[in-house]
């Protein structure tokens, strides 16, 4: 199971006990925010893309979307998300549990500047019902090969019904 792989990965940093396992799904930003009793923007969503030759993950705030212009300027390719059947093979995690922890060596990891607005965020931990509360500094420590980028834009708030 991917969560066990993440638990082992986080054990090297003394953080395996900080994984939050939920009784309900946290597979989407909204579900995760509800389950964790936090705002959607504090969910660190992990988006998986295909580069020129290798897959990569961009971790961004839950209220953000990829800005196609910034993305192309940064990565020199159009934003092309991995297909459903490619996600687990390229990230070691199924859709709903994709995270920056315990991913294959060939998969690059980027942290988007949108995360820096918060004192802490909640990335998934390999399953559709797990997360961990971390600061951006802690995320940098837990994912030492990650690089910071600025490729997202904040979504416009939706009007209330």
Regions found by a protein language model. Name each.
Residues 1-161:
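Extended, low-hydrophobicity, polar/charged segments
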């Amino acid at each position: 199971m991917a969560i066990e792989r993440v638990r082992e990965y986080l054990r090297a940093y003394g953080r395996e006990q900080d994984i939050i396992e939920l009784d309900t799904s946290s597979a989407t930003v909204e579900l995760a925010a509800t389950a964790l009793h936090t705002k959607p923007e504090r969910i660190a969503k992990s988006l998986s893309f295909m580069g020129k030759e290798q897959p990569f993950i961009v971790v961004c705030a839950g209220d953000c979307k990829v800005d196609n212009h910034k993305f192309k300027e940064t990565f020199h390719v159009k934003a092309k998300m991995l297909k459903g059947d490619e996600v687990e093979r390229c990230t070691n995690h199924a859709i709903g549990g994709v995270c920056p922890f315990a991913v294959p060596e060939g998969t690059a990891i980027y942290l988007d500047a949108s995360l820096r607005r918060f004192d802490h965020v909640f990335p998934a931990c390999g399953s559709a019902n797990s997360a961990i509360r971390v600061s951006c500094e802690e995320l940098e420590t837990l994912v030492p090969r990650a690089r910071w980028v600025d490729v997202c834009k904040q979504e416009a708030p939706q009007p209330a019904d």
